[in-house]
Structure formats: C-alpha cells, structure tokens
Amino acid sequence: MKHIALIVLYFLSFSVQAERLKDIASVQGVRENQLFGYGLVIGLNGTGDSTAFTNQSFVSMLSRFGVTLPEGVNATSKNVAAVSLTATLPAFSKPGQKIDVTVSSIGNASALRGGTLLLSTLKGADGAVYAIAQGNLVVGGLGANGADGSRTTGNVPTVGRIPNGASVERIVPSSFNTGDTLTFNLNRPDFTTAKQVTDKINNLLGPGVATTLDATSIRVSAPRDSSQRVTYLSILENLDVEVAEERARIVVNSRTGTIIIGQHVKVSPAAITHGSLTVTIKEVPPVVGKDGTITGGQTIVSPREGIEIAPNSGHMFVFDPGASLDDIVRAVNQVGAAPGDVMAILEGLKQAGAINADLVVI
C-alpha cells in the first residue's frame, strides 16, 4: 500500500526571520509582460502537420514571396508545422535586446526537432507588436517510429525553445518614473509584515516616509529625479525586514500523496469515520496539581488530547496526550491507508471545524 509522504514544517518566530525587501515584495509598475504569436516551423524531417490551417498558412507564406500555386494543387508538406509562440518581456526591456521564445506545436506534428522558425511577430495583450522572433529550435524530447507502425516518445518533442530567439522592438510604458511616491506590494499579503516594512523604512529615513495602505501595499515617498530614484530604490530593496509567521496551513498534493503541515496546526476534539477507519480525537482534563502558593495552592486543570484509530481489522492505536495532526497522519499510515483516505479524513476534520488551519489541495 502506498504510504503518504509527510513533511512537517517548523517556522521560526517572525522576530528572527529577516528577509530582503526585494525577496518579499515587488515595486508597483515594475512587471513582466506576456507575449504571444503564431508562426511556421520548417525543415522538419517528415514530422510536420497535415492540418488544413497549416496548409493555408504555408500557401500564404509562399504568396508573400511571389510564389503562386495553380488552382487545385495541394500544398501539403510534412516538413512544415504550425506553432504558437510565447515569450516573457522583462520590465524595462529596450529595443534590440534579446529574449527567449517557447515554440509549441498546434497541429498534429509528431516532432519539432531540427526545425527553424520563420520570421514571426510577438504581440502583447493590446495587440501591438513588441518583438520579432526567428531561429533554430532546441527540442529536448525524442520520438521514434518503427517499421511496423509502432511509435515511442520520450519527454515532449512537440515543444522547443529558441534561446535569445526574439528581438525586442517596442518599449512597454512604465509608471516607475512618474509621481513622487513608490508602492511596494507584498508577494504574500500580511498585515504584520506590512507593518514591519513600514517601520523599517521609517526608522531608516524618518517618520512618515512610508505608509501602510493595506495588508499588501506600502507607499513610500521617493525623489522625482530618475537617477536618484534608482539609487533610492536600491537602498530600500536591500533592507532586511522581519517577516511574520505564516498562517496555519496544510497543503495536500492529491497526485503525489504529499502532505505538508505547518507548525501552528491544532486539532480539536472530534470523531470521523471513513471507510474502514475510525478516528477519534478526545480531550481529557486531568488534575495536574497545586501551584505551590502560600495560601495552600490552587488546583490547575490542563486539557490533554488522545487519538484512537480503529480499522475494521480490530487494531486500535491509542496515542499519548498532546495529539497533533502529525500523529493522525502517521497513525493512518501505519494501518496501510491509501493517500485518498488520509486526504478525506483531513477534509472531514476541516469541515467539522476540528482543524484551525487552511487546507489547500493542489
């Protein structure tokens, strides 16, 4: 029986978690942009398309070079493939700079190995052309056909890359050099971390320089001169900021069976039955003793928890006081439960309010 891979994460207190500001936040207006396009890959060794739109694109390409085919002539070529193009345009990219291009087959081509992308445009979401792509593909996948019609494929031979295959042709407008403020946006919104960033900047530059807008954004006064602004931002993004602890969270990967449990996950008394398994979490209030005061002492009652897991086979597992979610997962593993059983139990406990953590299934 496949066992669950369990990882328990223990986070340090936020007072000792110092991160650079550039690692936990980004500057508003400084961002990448996605580009897309359509093109033809030629030079394939019989592994191209046989689709109608590829033939139409091929005929259109020939006509641009002054080649006109007679009516009724089929322009099908197994050495040509229609492809989609994607690329990421970094912030502040300037005309003439190079970016990588990812090329993916659209039709029924079996492989793009050895192909060359013809000159194609890359557009942004606004429809404007921002880059021009062309070049030889680097394909990591491998495909092979046997004489009897058999076929084997390794990795993905229908997707390739062209390193530095596109030339930037247009600048994306940016608000970085406008106004007299900068705004930092945290990658993971958190009120405590936002306050820590604000306090750190104000302690360095003076009161009122930074203002917390919400759990994500911190607005900072900045010089208008572009060169001074770059120096100013360089200082700020290298500040060490104390990062708050994350919320209690359980992450479950339903495909691999991996469960990641944060440090602050608590389990309350509950009982759940799933298939052949019964999980019982109970709280027992034992008497601990006296506090040792002069007045004779006061009885202190401290709650403790225990877990029982009973499969139909008659086995029962009783745990020491101080039950944790880690104990539950390990116990269910011991009776040979499938990954789906553990995930169903966790989801049931979450719905019943017995787990005070976010349950994230990926």
Curated annotation (Swiss-Prot):
Q: Where in the cell is it found?
A: Periplasm; Bacterial flagellum basal body
Pfam families reported in the protein's UniProt record = FlgI
Q: Which residues form the signal peptide?
A: 1-18
* One example of a Gene Ontology biological process annotation: bacterial-type flagellum-dependent cell motility
Alphabetic keyword roster: Bacterial flagellum, Periplasm, Signal
GO function terms (MF aspect): structural molecule activity
Membrane-crossing ranges are none
Question: Which GO cellular component terms are attached?
Answer: bacterial-type flagellum basal body, distal rod, P ring; outer membrane-bounded periplasmic space
Q: Which HAMAP family match?
A: FlgI
* Function description: Assembles around the rod to form the L-ring and probably protects the motor/basal body from shearing forces during rotation.
- Indicate the family of this protein: Belongs to the FlgI family.
Q: What is the annotated quaternary arrangement, including any partners?
A: The basal body constitutes a major portion of the flagellar organelle and consists of four rings (L,P,S, and M) mounted on a central rod.
In its UniProt entry, what is this protein called?
Flagellar P-ring protein
What is the source species?
Marinomonas sp. (strain MWYL1)
Q: Which gene encodes it?
A: flgI
